[in-house]
């Protein structure tokens, strides 16, 4: 998601470096802010509403990008949720939501872009995971599992494409970053 935090900052930095950025998230108002900021700095942006839990949205996002600019060079999979809670609290709906966004979102967006990268025989897929994928903590069991899945998927995909394909896969595992991600914590005992 490009509407806040790491995704917002990444899109802005890429645009300042000269990249045309297709930006997606569920919150269109935040996307429009980013689109305006990119354009104010002389860059090009295409803001599109995107729900990464829907494969059709991911496919349409990539197709609209290709329609506008003719190609996709880089995919940054950044959408994520972190509604921390202890497993014993059985917030199963939150577990499903994290799996849908944090894992399926990466899979669906990657699936949408791979045919284009294979056709042009180059590209870069960047998956934003978390150090939590390697360092599990109480109340983060499910979140950590989703981030471990992103890390494992990234490594497998990197090996599948190998150096001969000219398609690179990078997994970034940031530590704690003060973003709106913290606002998705619903367990009151963990919000302080």
Feature locations, PLM:
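Substrate-binding pocket helix/loop in short-chain dehydrogenase/reductase
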Residues: 86-87, 91-99
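Conserved glycine-rich cofactor-binding loop
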Residues: 3-4
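Conserved glycine-rich Rossmann-like NAD(P)H-binding loop of the short-chain dehydrogenase/reductase
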Residues: 19-34
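The beta1-alpha1 cofactor-binding region of Rossmann-like NAD(H)/NADP(H)-dependent oxidoreductases
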Residues: 28-29, 50-60, 92
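Active-site helix of classical SDR
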Residues: 110, 146
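Residue(s) in the substrate-gating loop at a strand-loop-helix junction
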Residues: 130
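Active-site loop immediately N-terminal to the catalytic Tyr-X3-Lys motif
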Residues: 88, 135-141
């Amino acid at each position: 998601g490009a509407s806040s935090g790491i995704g917002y900052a990444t899109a802005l930095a890429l645009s300042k470096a000269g990249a045309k950025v297709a930006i997606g998230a569920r919150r269109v108002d935040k996307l429009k802010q980013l689109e305006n900021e990119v354009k104010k700095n002389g860059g090009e942006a295409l803001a599109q509403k995107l729900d990464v839990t829907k494969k059709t949205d991911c496919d349409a996002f990539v197709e609209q990008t290709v329609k506008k600019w003719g190609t996709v060079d880089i995919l940054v999979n950044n959408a994520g949720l972190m509604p921390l809670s202890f497993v014993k609290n059985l917030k199963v709906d939150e577990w499903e939501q994290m799996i849908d966004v944090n894992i399926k979102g990466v899979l669906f967006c990657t699936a949408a872009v791979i045919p284009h990268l294979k056709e042009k025989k180059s590209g870069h897929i960047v998956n934003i995971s978390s150090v939590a994928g390697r360092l599990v903590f109480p109340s983060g069991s499910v979140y950590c599992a989703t981030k471990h899945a992103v890390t494992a998927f990234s490594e497998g995909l990197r090996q599948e494409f190998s150096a001969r394909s000219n398609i690179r896969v990078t997994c970034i595992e940031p530590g704690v970053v003060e973003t709106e991600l913290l606002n998705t914590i619903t367990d009151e005992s963990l919000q302080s």
